[in-house]
Every structure is written in C-alpha cells, then in structure tokens.
A protein has these predicted regions:
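Long, acidic (Asp/Glu-rich), low-complexity accessory segments flanking structured domains
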Residues: 234-250
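Amphipathic, small/basic residue-rich leader segments at the start of a protein or domain
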Residues: 1-99, 116-120, 124-127
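Flexible, small-/acidic-enriched active-site or ligand-binding loops
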Residues: 148, 206-234
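Single conserved hydrophobic/aromatic residue that forms the stacking wall/gate
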Residues: 263-272
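A short, Trp-centered hydrophobic/proline-enriched beta-strand micro-motif
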Residues: 128-137
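A structural signal for short hydrophobic beta-strand segments in well-ordered beta-sheet cores
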Residues: 151-154
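N-terminal glycine-rich flavin-associated loop
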Residues: 96-116, 145
Length: 272
C-alpha cells in the first residue's frame, strides 16, 4: 500500500496550516473570553460563524467526506493529516464543518439516506446551517457491543413510536442540534445483528428530553457536550427510517469505522 499523501492532500495541508496561522490561533483567546463573559456554558461564540465563512471561501469545507459530490473526495489516508492539524485547537474542526458527530451523521445520510432525507437534513448539515447528534449508547447495557441495545422503535401504522434512554449523546445539548440519528430495536426476533434500525428524530419532537449533561474528568464540554437523553413515546414518520429495518448495526459499523480512525488523529498533534 502506498502511504504517500496525494498532491491534493498536500495542497490542503498547506492551505489549512496557513488558515490556522491567520485565523485560528489569533482567535483562541477571544473564543474562550466570549464563553466566559457570556456566563452561559452553552454559549456559541460568534467568531465561529465568521471563521466558517472564511473557510468556505477557500474550499476548506467538508474535508472529511470521500464523496466528491460533497467534498474534496479524500481517502482516509489523505484526510488524516488534516484532522491532525485541526486537533491543535479543540474547537477548530467546526470551522471547517468537520466536527463530530456531524461528520459521521453526514456520512450515514450520504450513503444510506433517501433523496427526501438528504434534501431535508443532509443539505443543511453540509452547508453548516444546523448541527446534529447520534443516540446509540445506553446507560443500562454494555453498548460497545451494539447488539445489547435495548431501546425500542415500534411500528404503529405510518409511524414509529420510540422509547429509550441514551447517554454520551454528543452534541445533543447544542442549541443548534436540530436532528438526531437514533438507534433502537425494530425486529426483536431477527438474528442479533439484524434487530436494530436507525431513524431520524427531530430534536424538537414531543417526548425528547435532555436529562443531564455528562462529565469527563470534571468537564462537560459546554455546547458540544454528551448528555443523557430520554425518548418517551416519541412519534416519527416511517419515512425517517434510514436504510431499511434491521440495517442499524450495519450502518453503525459503516459510520464508526472511519470516524474512530479520524478521531484518533485529532488529539495526536498537540502532544508530539
């Protein structure tokens, strides 16, 4: 296997490093100061939106997507050094629309979503107009094995009724998170890897409740935090199903593989 970076990746690395020198590093203090002075841990500094517009102008946008219709079409190998650079400042990945969990959610919608789902949710995510969350991990089971997931997605005519508790639901507490990808059981009698499905749940749907923020070593990560979320008799149309009933585990594997790889690159640079 050739581990050399493509010319496109090298050019993007140079452009990204220049952007950091000119825009990211000079705004680190102002970013922290804006949150501190607001007195609101969920405050989103306006500088983020300003920097996003600058990034869009020079095509430093949606760098993670291998689909050339939505991004530069980089392989995981070519994207890795870009993720390493973004890891130098913890909030910078959002400037380039490359932050979790939106990256994995956009990959799901790009690969498995219907045309309607892409128009309603993928497009505004790609444009950076909204943010999203991913609800898979549960407090009552060992969720690293997704076959243990116990939340239910029950058919009811043209709708699904969703019940369950999730936690470490990254970004669910974000005021701009408008859509959630929820994983639960639709087909309990199927083989273990074919019981789960994934559905789109708008965060303003009745029955969706943020229970509490979760803390990691004392930090709650503010507006990008990972809260516990309760879904109680949440009703969504069946058109919100992604990839068909029983496809949830397969979709989760497709999502978590590349995302885990790129997440590992993010924290490497500051410590080498």
């Amino acid at each position: 296997m050739d581990f050399n970076y493509s010319n496109k990746s090298i050019e993007l690395q140079e452009s990204l490093l220049k952007f950091f020198d000119e825009h990211i590093y000079p705004n680190e203090i102002d970013y922290d100061k804006a949150i501190e002075e607001s007195g609101d841990p969920l405050h989103i500094p306006s500088i983020l939106e300003d920097l996003k517009e600058e990034a869009k102008k020079i095509n430093l946008w949606n760098l993670f997507l291998p689909d050339e219709n939505h991004g530069p079409g980089l392989s995981n190998l070519d994207y890795a050094p870009l993720a390493e650079i973004m890891g130098r400042v913890w909030w910078s990945s959002e400037v380039f629309n490359c932050s979790a969990p939106d990256t994995g959610n956009m990959e799901i919608l790009a690969e498995f979503g219907t045309d309607l789902q892409k128009e309603e949710w993928l497009k505004p995510l790609l444009d950076g107009q909204i943010r999203s969350c991913f609800a898979m991990t549960e407090p009552n089971v060992a969720s690293s094995d997704a076959t243990n997931i116990s939340s239910s997605i029950v058919s009811d005519g043209d709708n699904y009724v969703i019940n369950g508790r999730k936690w470490w639901t990254s970004n669910a507490i974000n005021p701009r998170a408008e859509i959630c990808i929820f994983m639960g059981i639709t087909n309990p009698d199927n083989p273990p890897h074919e019981r789960q499905s994934q559905v789109l749940v708008p965060m303003n749907t009745e029955g969706v409740t943020i229970v509490r923020p979760m803390h990691v070593f004392g930090y709650d990560d503010g507006y990008t935090g990972h809260p516990e979320v309760k879904f109680e008799n949440v009703i969504v149309p069946k058109t919100n199903l992604i990839g068909g009933e029983g496809a949830g585990f397969k979709i989760a594997q497709a999502r978590l593989g590349p995302v885990s790889y790129t997440h590992l690159t993010l924290p490497t640079t500051p410590y080498v």
